[in-house]
Amino acid sequence: MTSVVRGLSLFCLTFLVSCSNSILQDFSGEIYGTTYSVKIAENSSYAHLESKIKNELTRVDYVFSTYKPSSEISLINNGDSLEWSDEFRNLYETSQKISTLSGGAFSPKNDNGYDFSAIGKGYAIDKIAELVEQNGANNYFIEIGGEIRSKGAKFNGNWIFGIDRPINSKKSPYIAFNIPREGISIATSGEYREPNHIWGGGPRDLLSVTVAHESATYADAWATALYVLGKDQGLKTAESNGLAVFFISSSSDSTQSSNWSMISP
């Protein structure tokens, strides 16, 4: 199976994040060529986190962005640095693990060198979740470019998400349901919105693959790998690795792994 070495377009999930309490705090902006939003539903003010969130997202960008000449990954790819930070090495090892488990459908390298585009947003989400929890918040909803991680609830009930219809995202979501309060991360990958982000071969019999995982890093990488594997091999790989996955095929039919019922009964 040809490796995937570039990040896939991640379908925007339909977020139904309303709240009857004005305490809901939303810190949002732009990063990585897309948007981010961090919603916190707590009775204490978390205004002090706004700059910390932005700083952490920027810090991660200067480790993994191939578009910044001075980033760690750019310096390594250009031969200007031979040293790897622990953070870089850890993400490389995670990428290699997914590559092995997926039979090579995921790779942290392309012809230009190392590239963590297909795992970097998920990693950034996990880092922001760490920051939020370290500051005492346990009810939050983090989203970067259509990938999410949430925990707890908003003031008037569970956080809710929906998976867009790949063919016509303006219609109601393909599915929508409550996010488990104990916390979950979700990433969706596919080709129809940004086909240039798909590298390598594969059956191309899927419109989208959505993965739910405790780690946004793993959800991001697995969504990429399973999309490339295609419906049959992707489902087989999801089952063998105990993954919760929702597939939408090119005929707009859906298939799900057995563990998806733990996310949406």
Where are these regions (language model features)?
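Mature catalytic core of soluble alpha/beta enzymes
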Residues: 2-7, 11, 18-265
